[in-house]
Amino acid sequence: MTFRNCVAVDLGASSGRVMLARYERECRSLTLREIYRFNNGLHSQNGYVTWDVDSLESAIRLGLNKVCEEGIRIDSIGIDTWGVDFVLLDLQGKRVGLPVAYRDSRTNGLMTQAQQQLGKRDIYQRSGIQFLPFNTLYQLRALTEQQPELIPHIAHALLMPDYFSYRLTGKMNWEYTNATTTQLVNINSDDWDESLLAWSGANKAWFGRPTHPGNVIGHWICPQGNEIPVVAVASHDTASAVIASPLNGSRAAYLSSGTWSLMGFESQTPFTNDTALAANITNEGGAEGRYRVLKNIMGLWLLQRVLQERQINDLPALIAATQALPACRFTINPNDDRFINPDEMCSEIQAACRETAQPIPESDAELARCIVDSLALLYADVLHELAQLRGEDFSQLHIVGGGCQNALLNQLCADACGIRVIAGPVEASTLGNIGIQLMTLDELNNVDDFRQVVSTTANLTTFTPNPDSEIAHYVAQIHSTRQTKELCA
């Protein structure tokens, strides 16, 4: 038997993990084992919301060392993280300034300023990326405007996964899928857009040309002295998750469900027309030159904050209590900027309901019900927008990532969207990370080949839409009202 041992470092906004994958060539089987899991979260430092990158690096090294201590020969390592955030370095490779997190308020008002000065359509035609107030474009503008004293010291700007790869290897890389999330990469050239960089105040010399997934960045020397290749995987965690989504045919959509929910479809070409711009659709880079045509949705961040504020530890009990409540008594727009990082999420949700003359969710279960109903309704709206954009309905929706373990939300999504939902795999980002490593090691031919492996090894659960559910009737009523308004317009 021929085995490959690949290690995926998968960092999310709330946790990180070091996972060992064992691939058996002859039977094309893939097994995952968690080596080390650790917390991640936002910190307050000198008036900014930041990441503790030193703690994250220590946790990564600890996890890798644990694998080596077991006597396992590692064939390769890959790192994926969330998008848009970066670390600045000087000529000696030392950090400049703080690793500020995207939920910091320093970018307030800058997206509007960019649209006024550069033109919203021009920015979109150049980047093809969704307008989000925390995109790297606006973060760099905030930095160069608010902390100009740092500029003379900056030699390099590395996105988060590239920074951690650099810390392991001493080699710098700018991986393409994550680079596209910045709103600074030109969609036609796949290189940094000079006009957008100029507006941000950043120097193009801070960046190297983006590289597509599948190259070896450098090597990490383990405690035993072995040199282990560090592969540039699809380093944006959603790009990795999509690789591991067992999409079956062109009519399949995906939803990467976690702190963020990202819903979209794969395409060989980007969508940058006026319809896409009006819907605020993003065209992020994917593996093998594909585009991830998708839309960002605030996701389970809202529920995570409620759990934290109410000190709820028994999530299954909360979900059971939530399921017993009637649907759609309280609904909000999860994508409202007010929910990005409020002081108190529970109070913010209640205020939003109060302002729209709805009942106020008071109990833990009522707050959770408000969130899951609102997410399912937004999923239905976004799926409809995506279908209109491409001119064809979807036949099924694949929900992947940690959020796919929420059976209530999966069923609500199926009912609201009126579409079959297939949930799994849970560890989609990790698996997609491993998939690129196996392709780099010449064990697999391409993404479609890897998806066949995932389909046969992952635990998948199907949710069939119930047209008689409360939320399905609610959606039908909304659509009927919209059509009436359109006829009367």
Swiss-Prot record:
Enumerate the cofactors the protein uses. Answer: Mg(2+)
**Residues forming the catalytic site:** D237 (proton acceptor)
Known EC number: 2.7.1.5
Alphabetic keyword roster: ATP-binding, Disulfide bond, Kinase, Magnesium, Nucleotide-binding, Rhamnose metabolism, Transferase
Q: Which GO terms describe its biological process?
A: glycerol metabolic process; rhamnose catabolic process
Residue positions binding substrate = G83, H236, D237, T238, N296
S-S pairs = C68-C222, C353-C370, C413-C417
Question: What molecular functions are annotated in GO for this chain?
Answer: ATP binding; glycerol kinase activity; rhamnulokinase activity
User: What does the record give as its pathway?
Assistant: Carbohydrate degradation; L-rhamnose degradation; glycerone phosphate from L-rhamnose: step 2/3
| First-tier enzyme category under EC | transferase
Which CDD domains would you find in this protein's record? ASKHA_NBD_FGGY_RhaB-like
Gene Ontology CC terms, in alphabetical order: cytosol
Q: Which reaction equations make up its catalytic activity?
A: L-rhamnulose + ATP = L-rhamnulose 1-phosphate + ADP + H(+)
Any coiled-coil ranges, and where?
Answer: none
Query: A Pfam family name for this chain?
Result: FGGY_N
- UniProt binding sites for ATP: A13, S14, S15, G16, R17, T259, Q304, G402
NCBIfam families from the xrefs? PRK10640.1, rhamnulo_kin
According to its UniProt entry, the function of this protein is described as: Involved in the catabolism of L-rhamnose (6-deoxy-L-mannose). Catalyzes the transfer of the gamma-phosphate group from ATP to the 1-hydroxyl group of L-rhamnulose to yield L-rhamnulose 1-phosphate.
Describe the protein's quaternary organization and the partners it interacts with: Monomer.
The family classification in the record reads: Belongs to the rhamnulokinase family.
Per its record, how is this protein called by name? Rhamnulokinase
